[in-house]
Amino acid sequence: SPAQTQVNAALKRSGEAGNSVPSVDVKGYFASAAADTTTARIGSGTTIILTGNAFIRAKETTDLTAVSGAVAAGGVGAGGSVAVIILNGTTQAEIQGTIRAADTVSISAENTINGSSIQAKVGTAGLIGALGASVAYVDVTGTTGVLIGSGASITSGRNTTVRADLTVKASPVTSGASVGWAAVGLAASRLCVSGTTSILSVQGSSLTAENGNISLTAL
Protein backbone atom coordinates (compact mmCIF):
# COMPACT_ATOMS: atom_id res chain seq x y z
CA SER A 1 0.00 0.00 0.00
CA PRO A 2 1.14 3.64 -0.38
CA ALA A 3 1.24 4.00 3.41
CA GLN A 4 3.40 0.88 3.74
CA THR A 5 5.79 2.19 1.09
CA GLN A 6 6.16 5.51 2.91
CA VAL A 7 6.73 3.74 6.21
CA ASN A 8 9.50 1.56 4.81
CA ALA A 9 11.10 4.61 3.16
CA ALA A 10 11.01 6.45 6.47
CA LEU A 11 12.69 3.51 8.18
CA LYS A 12 15.49 3.53 5.63
CA ARG A 13 15.95 7.29 5.77
CA SER A 14 15.99 7.35 9.54
CA GLY A 15 19.62 6.29 9.34
CA GLU A 16 19.45 4.60 12.71
CA ALA A 17 18.90 0.99 11.67
CA GLY A 18 22.09 0.37 9.73
CA ASN A 19 21.86 -1.76 6.61
CA SER A 20 19.24 -4.11 8.00
CA VAL A 21 15.84 -2.46 7.91
CA PRO A 22 12.79 -4.62 8.56
CA SER A 23 9.49 -4.15 6.82
CA VAL A 24 6.88 -2.95 9.28
CA ASP A 25 3.18 -3.70 9.12
CA VAL A 26 1.51 -0.38 9.78
CA LYS A 27 -0.61 -0.27 12.95
CA GLY A 28 -0.36 3.43 13.71
CA TYR A 29 0.58 5.99 11.09
CA PHE A 30 0.73 9.76 10.81
CA ALA A 31 2.08 11.62 7.80
CA SER A 32 2.00 15.26 6.84
CA ALA A 33 3.65 17.38 4.14
CA ALA A 34 3.52 21.17 3.96
CA ALA A 35 4.69 23.48 1.19
CA ASP A 36 3.48 26.90 2.31
CA THR A 37 4.85 30.12 0.82
CA THR A 38 5.20 33.32 2.84
CA THR A 39 6.47 36.36 0.92
CA ALA A 40 7.00 40.05 1.62
CA ARG A 41 7.61 41.78 -1.72
CA ILE A 42 8.40 45.29 -2.92
CA GLY A 43 7.80 45.08 -6.65
CA SER A 44 9.69 46.60 -9.54
CA GLY A 45 8.77 50.26 -10.08
CA THR A 46 7.70 50.74 -6.45
CA THR A 47 9.30 53.63 -4.54
CA ILE A 48 9.03 53.97 -0.75
CA ILE A 49 10.43 57.08 0.98
CA LEU A 50 10.23 57.34 4.78
CA THR A 51 11.35 59.93 7.33
CA GLY A 52 11.85 57.19 9.94
CA ASN A 53 12.57 53.45 9.80
CA ALA A 54 11.67 50.91 7.12
CA PHE A 55 10.89 47.34 8.15
CA ILE A 56 10.16 44.64 5.57
CA ARG A 57 9.66 41.20 7.07
CA ALA A 58 8.42 37.82 5.87
CA LYS A 59 7.70 35.63 8.88
CA GLU A 60 6.44 32.05 9.07
CA THR A 61 5.85 30.10 12.29
CA THR A 62 4.89 26.41 12.20
CA ASP A 63 3.84 24.46 15.28
CA LEU A 64 4.05 20.68 14.78
CA THR A 65 2.09 18.01 16.62
CA ALA A 66 2.10 14.36 15.56
CA VAL A 67 1.39 11.32 17.70
CA SER A 68 1.17 7.79 16.32
CA GLY A 69 0.75 4.68 18.45
CA ALA A 70 0.19 0.93 18.18
CA VAL A 71 -0.20 -2.11 20.39
CA ALA A 72 -0.18 -5.74 19.24
CA ALA A 73 -0.49 -9.00 21.20
CA GLY A 74 -0.73 -12.69 20.32
CA GLY A 75 1.26 -15.78 19.46
CA VAL A 76 3.22 -13.85 16.84
CA GLY A 77 2.74 -10.10 16.88
CA ALA A 78 3.81 -7.28 14.61
CA GLY A 79 3.12 -3.66 15.35
CA GLY A 80 4.57 -0.57 13.75
CA SER A 81 4.16 3.10 14.56
CA VAL A 82 5.41 5.87 12.30
CA ALA A 83 5.18 9.66 12.44
CA VAL A 84 6.53 11.45 9.36
CA ILE A 85 6.50 15.21 8.79
CA ILE A 86 8.00 16.89 5.72
CA LEU A 87 8.26 20.68 5.47
CA ASN A 88 9.39 22.15 2.16
CA GLY A 89 7.88 25.62 2.12
CA THR A 90 9.36 29.00 1.20
CA THR A 91 9.74 32.11 3.35
CA GLN A 92 11.13 35.03 1.36
CA ALA A 93 11.53 38.80 1.47
CA GLU A 94 11.97 40.15 -2.05
CA ILE A 95 12.99 43.70 -2.97
CA GLN A 96 12.75 44.76 -6.60
CA GLY A 97 11.95 48.47 -6.13
CA THR A 98 13.37 51.47 -4.26
CA ILE A 99 13.42 51.98 -0.49
CA ARG A 100 14.81 55.11 1.15
CA ALA A 101 14.58 55.74 4.90
CA ALA A 102 16.06 58.58 6.94
CA ASP A 103 16.80 56.15 9.74
CA THR A 104 17.26 52.34 9.60
CA VAL A 105 16.25 49.88 6.88
CA SER A 106 15.63 46.32 8.11
CA ILE A 107 14.77 43.46 5.75
CA SER A 108 14.25 39.95 7.09
CA ALA A 109 12.93 36.49 6.29
CA GLU A 110 12.21 34.41 9.40
CA ASN A 111 11.10 30.79 9.48
CA THR A 112 10.49 29.23 12.90
CA ILE A 113 9.50 25.58 13.35
CA ASN A 114 8.39 24.32 16.76
CA GLY A 115 7.76 20.63 17.42
CA SER A 116 7.72 19.58 21.05
CA SER A 117 5.18 16.78 20.56
CA ILE A 118 6.28 14.50 17.72
CA GLN A 119 5.99 10.92 18.93
CA ALA A 120 5.83 7.39 17.59
CA LYS A 121 4.91 4.79 20.17
CA VAL A 122 4.69 1.03 19.87
CA GLY A 123 4.21 -1.88 22.26
CA THR A 124 4.05 -5.60 21.49
CA ALA A 125 3.71 -8.80 23.48
CA GLY A 126 3.71 -12.42 22.30
CA LEU A 127 4.54 -15.95 23.39
CA ILE A 128 6.61 -16.93 20.37
CA GLY A 129 7.95 -13.71 18.94
CA ALA A 130 7.21 -10.05 18.52
CA LEU A 131 8.43 -7.29 16.27
CA GLY A 132 7.78 -3.70 17.23
CA ALA A 133 9.11 -0.67 15.42
CA SER A 134 8.62 3.03 16.01
CA VAL A 135 9.92 5.79 13.77
CA ALA A 136 9.61 9.55 14.23
CA TYR A 137 11.02 11.49 11.30
CA VAL A 138 11.02 15.24 10.59
CA ASP A 139 12.51 16.54 7.33
CA VAL A 140 12.93 20.30 6.91
CA THR A 141 13.78 21.36 3.37
CA GLY A 142 12.60 24.44 1.50
CA THR A 143 14.04 27.94 1.36
CA THR A 144 14.36 30.85 3.77
CA GLY A 145 15.88 33.85 2.08
CA VAL A 146 16.11 37.48 1.05
CA LEU A 147 16.32 38.41 -2.62
CA ILE A 148 17.47 41.88 -3.67
CA GLY A 149 16.79 42.18 -7.37
CA SER A 150 18.92 43.73 -10.10
CA GLY A 151 16.90 46.96 -10.16
CA ALA A 152 16.57 47.34 -6.39
CA SER A 153 17.93 50.37 -4.54
CA ILE A 154 18.04 50.43 -0.73
CA THR A 155 19.30 53.50 1.13
CA SER A 156 19.27 54.23 4.85
CA GLY A 157 20.33 57.32 6.77
CA ARG A 158 21.84 55.05 9.40
CA ASN A 159 22.11 51.24 9.27
CA THR A 160 20.92 48.75 6.67
CA THR A 161 20.39 45.21 7.97
CA VAL A 162 19.41 42.16 5.93
CA ARG A 163 18.75 38.87 7.70
CA ALA A 164 17.56 35.36 6.77
CA ASP A 165 16.95 33.10 9.75
CA LEU A 166 15.78 29.48 10.00
CA THR A 167 15.11 28.28 13.56
CA VAL A 168 14.13 24.66 14.20
CA LYS A 169 13.04 23.56 17.67
CA ALA A 170 11.80 20.03 17.06
CA SER A 171 12.49 16.87 19.03
CA PRO A 172 11.08 13.71 17.43
CA VAL A 173 10.70 10.98 20.04
CA THR A 174 10.24 7.23 19.72
CA SER A 175 9.34 4.71 22.38
CA GLY A 176 8.91 0.97 22.08
CA ALA A 177 8.61 -2.08 24.29
CA SER A 178 8.26 -5.74 23.40
CA VAL A 179 7.88 -8.76 25.67
CA GLY A 180 8.03 -12.45 24.68
CA TRP A 181 10.25 -15.50 24.39
CA ALA A 182 11.92 -13.83 21.42
CA ALA A 183 11.45 -10.13 20.99
CA VAL A 184 12.91 -7.56 18.63
CA GLY A 185 12.29 -3.82 18.86
CA LEU A 186 13.45 -0.99 16.60
CA ALA A 187 13.20 2.64 17.62
CA ALA A 188 14.52 5.38 15.36
CA SER A 189 14.11 9.14 15.52
CA ARG A 190 15.67 11.73 13.31
CA LEU A 191 15.51 15.44 12.60
CA CYS A 192 16.92 16.25 9.15
CA VAL A 193 17.45 19.90 8.19
CA SER A 194 18.59 20.24 4.60
CA GLY A 195 16.91 23.47 3.56
CA THR A 196 18.57 26.60 2.20
CA THR A 197 19.04 29.86 4.10
CA SER A 198 20.39 32.61 1.87
CA ILE A 199 20.72 36.28 1.04
CA LEU A 200 21.07 37.05 -2.66
CA SER A 201 21.91 40.52 -3.92
CA VAL A 202 21.79 40.38 -7.70
CA GLN A 203 24.26 42.30 -9.84
CA GLY A 204 22.91 45.79 -10.47
CA SER A 205 21.29 46.15 -7.04
CA SER A 206 22.34 48.87 -4.61
CA LEU A 207 22.62 48.90 -0.79
CA THR A 208 23.71 52.08 0.98
CA ALA A 209 24.05 53.11 4.63
CA GLU A 210 24.89 56.82 4.60
CA ASN A 211 25.88 57.17 8.26
CA GLY A 212 26.08 53.63 9.54
CA ASN A 213 26.77 50.03 8.63
CA ILE A 214 25.46 47.39 6.24
CA SER A 215 24.90 43.98 7.82
CA LEU A 216 24.02 40.79 5.91
CA THR A 217 23.31 37.69 8.03
CA ALA A 218 22.06 34.23 7.02
CA LEU A 219 21.56 31.67 9.80
Task: Label every model-predicted segment.
Residues 1-219:
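Low-complexity, glycine- and small/polar-enriched segments
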